[in-house]
């Protein structure tokens, strides 16, 4: 079947009333960015639907795949656009039915947005179904559990007919919900947290704390790869890599061993808070899950949050670990996240970290040293990378160069 359009159905943005135009425009911009590099199509965003007009050479499978990854899209269908006549609809219905397997069942489903069309829904269903039965042998009607469903949408401008409905990612268009800073550790949880907030229309930049030589270049490249996977959905993402060795060593020098984990997280939050204001973000996002580890109890969260007035969003707060793993596999980050390269959260880990830290004690331990200068120095020396979906690490670039030189 040669389709001439893709029908793109909006997600929750259809509920946005007077703000709908803003959401539709943002989604259209996101679609154009996602489809960059492809040709043979024209995007037409309308109030209730988006239509993508296809030329003969358009790569419909690649276009559909990319659309399915864009937040704000509920579903996509390859469609035939036909004239608003029963003859044109009947001819298209026969085209669809000619693709059916022998002895298969079908159903005609009609949605009539144009209430002025001369035939009502049931008349159209009977007429088109009857035409298929007359013209195509060895098929029958089954309205409850059909093998095939020919869908007909009667709209003001034309008739759109299709069979396939490809699920989209749902949610809201990224860019409609403000900017946040994602604390990206390299584990399983934080990439999922980032994906969850992006699904709500939020733009992210990411921050990663790197402590060489205790953490390796492989750990850094792992985080770059996780950011690249996230960027496949939304376009370029800025990754801010913080030199954290000096701060982490100082914490372990002056803070009681059982409190070093709590204090380390507080230092991370203080650095993140300064960066939030620099980049114009409105919140900090992390992958914390309530009660999962010592640093993620309510007592710990209270002690850590106290260093910032910036809202801290925890989209995975109540998830079971298995739920997070399933989502990680769905979005494609799991295999990268489980690579065995230590991040700064796993080094210097005390044997018995306190699970219910006393806030006054944390402050007392940290008061013996003024960390502000170190924090400012860490912020000043941040390395910022813009990660795109085709970003290559330095190691990959060097490998490619060696191959090219050899050839």
From Swiss-Prot:
GO terms for cellular component: cytosol. It catalyses: [ThiI sulfur-carrier protein]-S-sulfanyl-L-cysteine + a uridine in tRNA + 2 reduced [2Fe-2S]-[ferredoxin] + ATP + H(+) = [ThiI sulfur-carrier protein]-L-cysteine + a 4-thiouridine in tRNA + 2 oxidized [2Fe-2S]-[ferredoxin] + AMP + diphosphate; [ThiS sulfur-carrier protein]-C-terminal Gly-Gly-AMP + S-sulfanyl-L-cysteinyl-[cysteine desulfurase] + AH2 = [ThiS sulfur-carrier protein]-C-terminal-Gly-aminoethanethioate + L-cysteinyl-[cysteine desulfurase] + A + AMP + 2 H(+). It comes from the Bacteria. InterPro entries: Rossmann-like_a/b/a_fold, ThiI_AANH, ThiI_fer, ThiI_N, THUMP_dom, THUMP_ThiI, tRNA_STrfase, tRNA_sulfurtransferase_ThiI. It is found in: Cytoplasm. Gene3D superfamilies: 3.30.2130.30, HUPs. Keywords: ATP-binding, Cytoplasm, Nucleotide-binding, RNA-binding, Thiamine biosynthesis, Transferase, tRNA-binding. Pathway: Cofactor biosynthesis; thiamine diphosphate biosynthesis. Its EC number is 2.8.1.4. Transmembrane segments: none annotated. ATP binds at residues 183-184, 208-209, 265, 287, 296. GO terms for biological process: thiamine biosynthetic process; thiamine diphosphate biosynthetic process; thiazole biosynthetic process; tRNA 4-thiouridine biosynthesis. Its main location: cytoplasm. Residues 61-165 form the THUMP domain. Pfam families: ThiI (PF02568), ThiI_fer (PF22025), THUMP (PF02926). One of its GO terms (molecular function) is CCA tRNA nucleotidyltransferase activity. Catalyzes the ATP-dependent transfer of a sulfur to tRNA to produce 4-thiouridine in position 8 of tRNAs, which functions as a near-UV photosensor. Also catalyzes the transfer of sulfur to the sulfur carrier protein ThiS, forming ThiS-thiocarboxylate. This is a step in the synthesis of thiazole, in the thiamine biosynthesis pathway. The sulfur is donated as persulfide by IscS. Belongs to the ThiI family. NCBIfam families: tRNA uracil 4-sulfurtransferase ThiI. This is Probable tRNA sulfurtransferase. It comes from Staphylococcus aureus (strain Mu3 / ATCC 700698).
């Amino acid at each position: 079947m040669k389709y001439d359009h893709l029908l793109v159905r909006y997600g929750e943005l259809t509920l946005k009333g007077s703000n709908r135009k803003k959401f539709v425009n943002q989604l259209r911009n996101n679609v154009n960015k996602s489809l960059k590099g492809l040709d043979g199509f024209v995007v037409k965003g309308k109030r209730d639907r988006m239509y993508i007009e296809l030329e003969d050479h358009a790569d419909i499978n690649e276009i559909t795949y990319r659309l399915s990854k864009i937040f704000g899209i509920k579903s996509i269908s390859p469609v035939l656009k036909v004239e608003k006549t029963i003859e044109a609809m009947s001819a298209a219905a026969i085209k669809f039915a000619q693709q059916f397997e022998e002895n298969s069942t079908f159903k005609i489903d009609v949605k009539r947005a144009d209430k002025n069309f001369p035939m009502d829904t049931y008349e159209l269903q009977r007429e088109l179904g009857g035409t298929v039965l007359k013209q195509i042998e060895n098929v029958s009607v089954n309205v409850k559990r059909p093998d095939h469903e020919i869908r007909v949408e009667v709209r003001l401008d034309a008739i759109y007919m299709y069979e396939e409905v490809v699920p989209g990612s749902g949610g809201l268009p990224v860019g409609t919900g403000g900017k946040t800073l994602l604390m990206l550790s390299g584990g399983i949880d934080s990439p999922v947290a980032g994906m969850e907030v992006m699904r709500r229309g939020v733009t992210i930049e990411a921050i990663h704390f790197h402590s060489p030589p205790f953490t390796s270049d492989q750990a850094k490249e792992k985080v770059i790869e996780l950011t690249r996977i996230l960027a496949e959905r939304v376009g370029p993402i800025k990754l801010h890599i913080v030199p954290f060795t000096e701060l982490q060593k100082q914490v372990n020098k002056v803070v009681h061993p059982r409190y070093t984990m709590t204090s380390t997280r507080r230092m991370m939050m203080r650095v993140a808070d300064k960066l939030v204001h620099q980049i114009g973000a409105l919140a900090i996002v992390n992958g914390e899950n309530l009660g999962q580890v010592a640093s993620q109890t309510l007592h710990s969260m209270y002690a850590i949050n106290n260093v910032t007035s910036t809202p801290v969003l925890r989209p995975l707060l109540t998830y079971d670990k298995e739920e997070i793993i399933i989502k990680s596999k769905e979005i494609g980050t799991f295999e990268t996240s489980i690579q065995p390269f230590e991040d700064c959260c796993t080094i210097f880990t005390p044997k018995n970290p306190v699970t219910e830290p006393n806030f006054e004690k944390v402050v007392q331990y940290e008061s013996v040293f003024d960390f502000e200068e170190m924090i400012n120095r860490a912020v000043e020396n941040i390395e910022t990378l813009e990660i795109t979906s085709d970003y290559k690490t330095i190691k990959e670039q060097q490998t490619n160069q060696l191959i090219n030189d050899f050839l």
